UniProtKB/Swiss-Prot annotation:
Keywords: Chaperone, Periplasm, Protein transport, Signal, Transport
UniProt signal peptide: 1-21
CDD domains associated with the record: LolA
Name recorded for this polypeptide: Outer-membrane lipoprotein carrier protein
Record HAMAP family: LolA
GO biological process, one term: lipoprotein localization to outer membrane
Protein family: Belongs to the LolA family.
Upper taxonomic lineage: Bacteria, Pseudomonadati, Pseudomonadota, Gammaproteobacteria, Alteromonadales
Coiled coil: none
Function in brief: Participates in the translocation of lipoproteins from the inner membrane to the outer membrane. Only forms a complex with a lipoprotein if the residue after the N-terminal Cys is not an aspartate (The Asp acts as a targeting signal to indicate that the lipoprotein should stay in the inner membrane).
Amino acid sequence: MKKLLCAVLLSPLLYSNAVLADDAKQLRETLNGTESLKADFKQTVTDINKKVIQTGAGVFALAHPNQFYWHLTAPDESQIVADGKDLWIYNPFAEEVVIMDFAEAINASPIALLVHRDDATWSQYSVAKKQDCYEIKPKATDAGISSVNVCFNKGTLNKFNVLDDKGNQSQFDLSNQHSISAADKALFKFVLPENVDVDDQRLKSQ
């Protein structure tokens, strides 16, 4: 998730620009109704042959604007926290924390649309509706992801999947969805653990 990949352009024979624009508008309107969300997730990763190569579980949360929380609890623990300015990636096993500029880290992925509302970010992606799901594809050729599908049930995000350029697909099924509470807001504030190595990549880009 640290670096997400690729761009596959939609065929003009299948979708007109007007239809794509309308689908993007519908997705934006749906997301505008979700100022915050917290949920449990189960992750299933399959390869190009649809063989399961990994499963996992954890907790996921987001809040507008630009706040994100991801805590993988199994099989190996890891944590990603974005406070709107910085993004922190914590690997307890390696005792390492990587700090990145939020905009650079998130904007490379269609997942950015879940927390961004600005026109500039949305203009970087094509959106096509397929029943209760929306397929999002980056227009750039070096984005790091082929596509993301986000699906809703009665306006509530209930699953999404990420497809990379090697054909690997990560499916995330959500449960126990609810708006974040006042106490949950602490999730978006990363507390640096003691005795960990820190790789501050924000300094490298300055």
